[in-house]
């Protein structure tokens, strides 16, 4: 399918994962406005990279990493058709290969890393291999993703990811091993009156892993927030409207 946003267009017909509300929420909520060097892991159609480009200062550089051949072609096409063809650069390959090359070349770390990751560690996989890789941790496990974040994120940087409820605990439990913690967590409720079914995490380096815990260096705490997408009548909430107004045509 094709999706037209206020400032760019996305063709995702060849991608394992189509444009989704999850991705739009992630791209709209992530704190990108002060970032000058952004990494999009598993870029797919390039949606998050282009949302980041729209929200970022003109001097920002963005690297979109995508391993799937068809998705990489779609991503490159969407980038070239956008107003930010000079801002967003595509790396076609595995994030592990990108990390190794990046570290070997002693290139600058990233102020912000954004990722809508494969999140199912178990369960029935789609017959389409591209969709299976996009949904399951076949090519990028939670541990591998967190290791990449720990290696490529600048000391004061933030990584933003979105996960369904069933994957949240497993992901968070592994963060400490890589010197990371959840600074902010946005729990998302699809319809008013329901329970949250996915969360966006703002991940940062854990300062207590580098320095002993003291009165002046207390244990880090997570800030918890919550938003509802639609009310009981199916209308977008004011929070949803405010968040997505810069992107959705009809808001």
Curated annotation (Swiss-Prot):
One of its GO terms (molecular function) is nucleic acid binding. GO terms for cellular component: cytoplasm. It is found in: Cytoplasm. Pfam families: MTS. It is an enzyme of class 2 (transferase). Its EC number is 2.1.1.223. Keywords: Cytoplasm, Methyltransferase, S-adenosyl-L-methionine, Transferase, tRNA processing. One of its GO terms (biological process) is tRNA processing. It catalyses: adenosine(37) in tRNA1(Val) + S-adenosyl-L-methionine = N(6)-methyladenosine(37) in tRNA1(Val) + S-adenosyl-L-homocysteine + H(+). Disulfide bonds: none annotated. Belongs to the methyltransferase superfamily. tRNA (adenine-N(6)-)-methyltransferase family. Specifically methylates the adenine in position 37 of tRNA(1)(Val) (anticodon cmo5UAC). This is tRNA1(Val) (adenine(37)-N6)-methyltransferase. The lineage of its organism: Bacteria, Pseudomonadati, Pseudomonadota, Gammaproteobacteria, Alteromonadales.
């Amino acid at each position: 399918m094709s999706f037209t946003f206020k400032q760019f267009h996305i063709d995702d017909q060849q991608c394992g994962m189509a444009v989704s509300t999850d991705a739009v929420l992630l791209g709209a909520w992530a704190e990108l406005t002060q970032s000058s060097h952004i990494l999009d892991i598993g870029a797919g159609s390039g949606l998050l990279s282009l949302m980041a480009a729209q929200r970022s200062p003109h001097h920002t550089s963005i690297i979109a990493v995508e391993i799937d051949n068809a998705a990489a072609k779609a991503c490159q096409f969407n980038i070239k058709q956008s107003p930010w063809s000079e801002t967003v650069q595509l790396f076609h390959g595995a994030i592990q290969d990108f990390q190794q090359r990046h570290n070997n070349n002693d290139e600058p770390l990233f102020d912000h890393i954004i990722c809508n990751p494969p999140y199912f560690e178990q369960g029935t996989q789609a017959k389409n291999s591209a969709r299976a890789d996009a949904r399951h941790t076949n090519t990028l496990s939670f541990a591998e993703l967190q290791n990449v974040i720990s290696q490529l994120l600048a000391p004061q940087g933030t990584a933003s990811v979105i996960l369904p409820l069933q994957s949240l605990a497993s992901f968070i439990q592994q963060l400490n091993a890589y010197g990371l913690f959840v600074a902010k967590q946005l729990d998302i409720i699809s319809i008013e009156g329901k329970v949250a079914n996915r969360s966006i995490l703002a991940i940062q380096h854990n300062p207590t892993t580098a320095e002993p815990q003291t009165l002046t260096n207390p244990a880090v705490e997570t800030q918890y927030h919550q938003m509802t997408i639609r009310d009981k009548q199916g209308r977008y909430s004011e929070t949803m409207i405010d968040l997505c107004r810069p992107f959705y045509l009809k808001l």
